[in-house]
Structure formats: C-alpha cells, structure tokens
Amino acid sequence: LGGSGAGGGDSDAADLVVAEIRDSGGDAIANKASVSDRDGASSIIKDAVDTFGTVDILVNNAGILRDRSFRKMTLDDWDIVMNVHMNGTAYVTHAAWQVMYEKNYGRIVCTSSGSGIWGNFGQANYGAAKTAMVGFMNVLALEGASHNMRINCLAPGAATRMTATVPGRPPIDVDAPPPERAPSLVTPAVLYMCSEDAPTGRIFQAMGGRFSQAAMYTNPGVELGTEASFETFCDNLDTITD
C-alpha cells in the first residue's frame, strides 16, 4: 500500500489503512518503500520485526499495470511490471524467509492472476509476472516444508485502485464498488492461506464470493523410448494430448 498505481511513492492509501486498523483497536505501521528496490523491500520486513518482534505472515500484494498489446508494449512497460510483481515479491519474501526459517513458522501468500493462468489480451507483461508467482510458490513450498513454512497463491478478482486503470472497463468507484466487486469477498481465501491449517503449494481463485482451486496437470502420456522421432510423436499425438 506504500505506492501509487502509477508507480510513484504516494503513500496516502497506506496511511488510511493504518488509521483504519488503529481506529478498530489494532496496531499497524506504514512503510513507504518500493518493493522493487532491494533495500526498500528489506526495510519492510525490518520495520515489521523492529515494531512487532517477528513476522508470521507475509501477503505479497503490491501491483502495477502497463496494459497494451505486445506489439505496442515498450520494454520499459515490460520492466516496470516485472520489477514490481516478480522481483518485488522475491525481494520481500527473501527478507521474510530468513526470519520464518529460523523460527520454524511462516505463512506466505503470493498474488497471482487469471491473466497469467488463463491469459488476458493486452497483459503479456502482467500475465508473465503473475504466472511466475506459481513457479516461485512451487519451489518455496518444497524448500519451506521442513520448517513449517507454507506458501500459496491467490488469483483474486475485485475492484481496486489498480484495476480502475484497466482500459475499456466501465468506471467504478473503488471506495464504494458494486457488491460483487468488493475486495472483502476475497478475504476468506486469504485468511485461510494465512491460518494454522493452511495447505501449501495451492492456487486459490476468489472473486465475487466464488472460490475455486486452479491447478496444472499432466496426463499419462505415452512412452516412445529411445527410438522416439517426429513421426512416432505425431503418430501418438491423440494419446499424448488426451
């Protein structure tokens, strides 16, 4: 929440959330650093540890969009989205990982997207970064298992400051979205992934009160042996793709 949807350092949203939490009787701090900066990402975890003593849960949810067809997309459009979504997630998680590993406990949520899992026109940069979350999760789920660290992906759908910038979508008041676009309807899945009973290595989709699990699969395939060739591959294509 420490930055603006345009990639700047506007921290108004973070301050508002902190105020809301404190008004409700909780305790919170805002960190104004960018997740795409290594030192800034590390400072997020350092501030949390300095203030609260440790880190039990990390939800990687920083985001930015630069939507346009790949033909019209600049490499700067590509880099800024990758730096925030992919590198930012890695940087913050790397800092938190050390704390969680030593204490033998941690819950991590990475924000993926249907734009990466299923594809969405004009979002090659965003879709690639969001699919990277799945590969990142798969490896860390293995590496963290022996230390009670569980990591999952969320593929959410809701009205936010970021989605309000998507070209072609009707304007929505993100402070008072339609009920079916309320971010609060994503919350149950996030709470589950942060709980004691959280699984690991799963992708949960959540939008408008509808929840599902997405997964990659492999079929039985066919064994062509050491004599495999283009011809035998094509001859067995029906079985390979069944």
Set out the residue ranges of the language-model regions.
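Active-site helix of classical SDR
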Residues: 93, 129
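Residue(s) in the substrate-gating loop at a strand-loop-helix junction
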Residues: 113
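The beta1-alpha1 cofactor-binding region of Rossmann-like NAD(H)/NADP(H)-dependent oxidoreductases
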Residues: 11, 15, 32-46, 75
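Active-site-adjacent segment of SDR/Rossmann-fold oxidoreductases
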Residues: 99-102, 118, 134, 139-149, ...
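A glycine-rich helix->loop->beta "capping" turn
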Residues: 24-27, 47-60, 66-69, 105, ...
